[in-house]
Amino acid sequence: MTIHVKNNIHWVGQRDWEVQDFHGTEYKMTKGTSYNSYLIREEKTVLIDTVDHRFSQQFIQNLQMEIDLQSIDFIVINHAEEDHSGALSALMEKIPNTPIYCTEAAIDSIVGHHHHPEWNFKTVKTGDSIDIGNGKQLVFVEAPMLHWPDSMMTYLTGDAVLFSNDAFGQHYCDERLFNDEVDQAELMEQCLRYYSNILTPFSALVTAKIQEVLSFNLPVDMIATSHGIVWRENPTQIIEQYLAWANDYQEDRITIFYDSMSNNTRMMADAIAQGIHDVDPSVAVKVFNVSKQDKNEILANVFRSKGILVGSSTMNNVMMPKIAGMLEEITGLRFKAKKAAAFGSYGWNGGAVDRIHARLTDAGFETAISLKTKWRPDGKAMRECREHGQQIAKLWAVKDKSTLSTPVNAFQSATPIEGIEAQQPLTETTPTADAAHSADCQCMVCTVCNWVYDPAKGEPNQGIEVGTTWADVPDYFLCPECHLGKDVFVEYQG
């Protein structure tokens, strides 16, 4: 199967709907991915990149249905990682003398993976070009550490197509190839997830490389990535977004993540979140349990945030292993211009919180005062947690919010869907208690999640009938929202 991209350019890649892991198991793919390879047929026939090694035979069979493999004049490998050069060994068995154009660093990577130093390598550097006929040239631009030392981009004159490799891509699989054809919110989510988890450490290089490419004053009508969609409509929007993401990006957002042995640290996290909201309802607060939720989504939220709070129970005088792992990843991602604080519960010794604070400081975060709670937080401790959240909100408040990045939830499409009118965005609100409960009800409110128990409604999912007073609610009752017991409830002051 091939897809026409533009003029004499065709996509000859491979979709992978089922893949879930990338870089071992470090990156979770929620939307599959594609391995994009492109065939250019001018006076010379050029293949740009291959596909993952698992699809080598399918890739070659697909190519053979399109062209005689012997007609390929040369191959361009923009990046030697196996998801781009993986089918090279199988292909070179059929056309062993075909020149391979790549950076000098890529030769080491390709030989290291495929063990064929005898292949016909042709090294290129920024500004080098090859005439492929019909008045068109391929121009090469080295892009070291975006995201490997061997990375480069290739630009096709005449058609004004930039083959950008990993840059501007995303792990996103769809039968449709072009950006204007797919769900724009999904596309934005996957682009941000990809940048925040993979390219963040190289943000300074991203800015420098984009500025270098722009300095060439080359028109860009299309950006053909190595994963995900091809940017056809307004292709420079992703370039502009990358420049924003690379510039110490932060929204008016605070991310809290934690791990907990007995839900004690979770209770603290929820109360801290409520305290932040008390002081600044406009700030987006997200709470994650690292043992239960997607690590890469957490890291994407850290990337978006102006500050983070990291919580852990103390185990053997150190932090929980998953928190330690997250902090190691955060250190490697080298986030800039962000604030942080540690918190956690403990029984004998609160060593975890001290270690988290130290790790966050070492990772370059501006750290605030930590918070420890001994054993299970009681009412007094929960109030202290909430007050801590209030203090954090004040401490991390940004006076001029215009200096923060405006979150973009979707790329802009110039082609509206017929029959659907744009709606005003909904404002996230919590319904007022007065709207749901009468002022004289004998209600109880959960101090962790604010869920309200109303005797007039009962809780049928737990067998508690309408009219059951709080005193008669069984001790086994759990809050339907946060799954904590009766002891976290207080009288509702509606």
Curated annotation (Swiss-Prot):
SMART domains listed in its UniProt record: Lactamase_B
Pathway involvement of the protein, from the record: Nitrogen metabolism; nitric oxide reduction
UniProt-annotated stretches for the region Zinc metallo-hydrolase: 30-210
Residue ranges annotated for the Rubredoxin-like domain, each copy included: 441-492
Subunit structure, interactors included: Homotetramer.
Function: Anaerobic nitric oxide reductase; uses NADH to detoxify nitric oxide (NO), protecting several 4Fe-4S NO-sensitive enzymes. Has at least 2 reductase partners, only one of which (NorW, flavorubredoxin reductase) has been identified. NO probably binds to the di-iron center; electrons enter from the NorW at rubredoxin and are transferred sequentially to the FMN center and the di-iron center. Also able to function as an aerobic oxygen reductase.
Protein name in the entry: Anaerobic nitric oxide reductase flavorubredoxin
Source organism: Vibrio vulnificus (strain CMCP6)
Taxonomic placement: Bacteria, Pseudomonadati, Pseudomonadota, Gammaproteobacteria, Vibrionales
Name of the gene: norV
